[in-house]
C-alpha cells in the first residue's frame, strides 16, 4: 500500500512540474507587455511612440509598413511575415534612431 501511495505522489509531482506552455518571460502572446522581441511568439515587440509601453504584436503583412531590423529589440513598425521583404530606406542613422521604415512586398511576386 505504501508503494502505491509513493508512486501516486511521485506521479502528481511530475504532473505539476510540467511547465505551462504560456510563458511569463518568453513565448508571450500578442498584446502582452515585453522588453525585447525575443520574448514574443511573433518575434515583434512593438511600441507606438517613444513613451508608450511595448507590447507583442503580429508581424507586418503584405503592403503594410515595416522595419527591416532593429538594434534595440523593440520596433516602431514590426518586421514582415515570412516570405515577404521590407523594401525602403536603410541608413546607419535610421538604424540608430530606429526610423528605417519600408513596406512589405512579396519578393517572388514583385520580380514577375
Curated annotation (Swiss-Prot):
Residues 1-17 form the signal peptide. GO terms for molecular function: enzyme activator activity; lipase binding. PROSITE patterns: COLIPASE_1, COLIPASE_2. Disulfide bonds join 34-45, 40-56, 44-78, 66-86, 80-104. GO terms for cellular component: extracellular region. Transmembrane segments: none annotated. Residues 18-22 form a propeptide. It is found in: Secreted. SMART domains: COLIPASE. Its main location: secreted. One of its GO terms (biological process) is response to food. CDD domains: CLPS. Expressed by the pancreas. InterPro entries: CLPS_chr, Colipase, Colipase_C, Colipase_CS, Colipase_N. Keywords: Digestion, Disulfide bond, Lipid degradation, Lipid metabolism, Secreted, Signal. Forms a 1:1 stoichiometric complex with pancreatic lipase. Colipase is a cofactor of pancreatic lipase. It allows the lipase to anchor itself to the lipid-water interface. Without colipase the enzyme is washed off by bile salts, which have an inhibitory effect on the lipase. Belongs to the colipase family. This is Colipase.
Amino acid at each position: 500500500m505504501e508503494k502505491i501511495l509513493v508512486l501516486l505522489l511521485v506521479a502528481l509531482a511530475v504532473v505539476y512540474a510540467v511547465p505551462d506552455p504560456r510563458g511569463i518571460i518568453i513565448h508571450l502572446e500578442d498584446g502582452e507587455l515585453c522588453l525585447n522581441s525575443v520574448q514574443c511568439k511573433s518575434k515583434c515587440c512593438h511600441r507606438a511612440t517613444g513613451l508608450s509601453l511595448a507590447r507583442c504584436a503580429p508581424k507586418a503583412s503584405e503592403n503594410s509598413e515595416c522595419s527591416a531590423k532593429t538594434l534595440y529589440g523593440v520596433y516602431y513598425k514590426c518586421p514582415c511575415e515570412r516570405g515577404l521583404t521590407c523594401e525602403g530606406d536603410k541608413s546607419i542613422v535610421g538604424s540608430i534612431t530606429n526610423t528605417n521604415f519600408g513596406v512589405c512586398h512579396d519578393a517572388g511576386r514583385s520580380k514577375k
